[in-house]
Amino acid sequence: MKKISIALILLISSTFFACKPKSKPTDDIKSIRFKFTELGRETQFRIACDKFDSYFPEGRVKNFTQKAGVDSVMQLLTNMQRAEEGNLPDVRGKIYITHTNSITDTVCVGVKVLNYKDAVYQTPQELLALIQK
């Protein structure tokens, strides 16, 4: 009888843990900050991600701290299509995604492609529109 009650308690507790609602990936994001220059600005050469701040130190800045704003940006970033290998962005902006554990991800944004988590994606036009708003 004692073994049955222990097994029943283990079964019930494992059921509670299995039914616990999963947190959304956007729940661990504290803020998002855009730093950008004019998207149509032409230069004689491609601006690399690590050189963006030195070429455009006075860029415009937008901050998103409200959950609705953070969710809308993250939805755009999670539904992106991969770009062809070898494409690198001509960087016109950066997105800094700060997580609740103070780790910051950087997205390097070009008009055609962007670099996020060591992968190159096609830049969503909705993201460009959001940046320019």
Task: Give the ranges of each region predicted by the language model.
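Function-determining sites in protein domains
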Residues: 20-133
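C-terminal motif of bacterial Sec signal peptides marking the signal peptidase cleavage site
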Residues: 15-18
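Sec-dependent N-terminal signal peptides
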Residues: 4-13
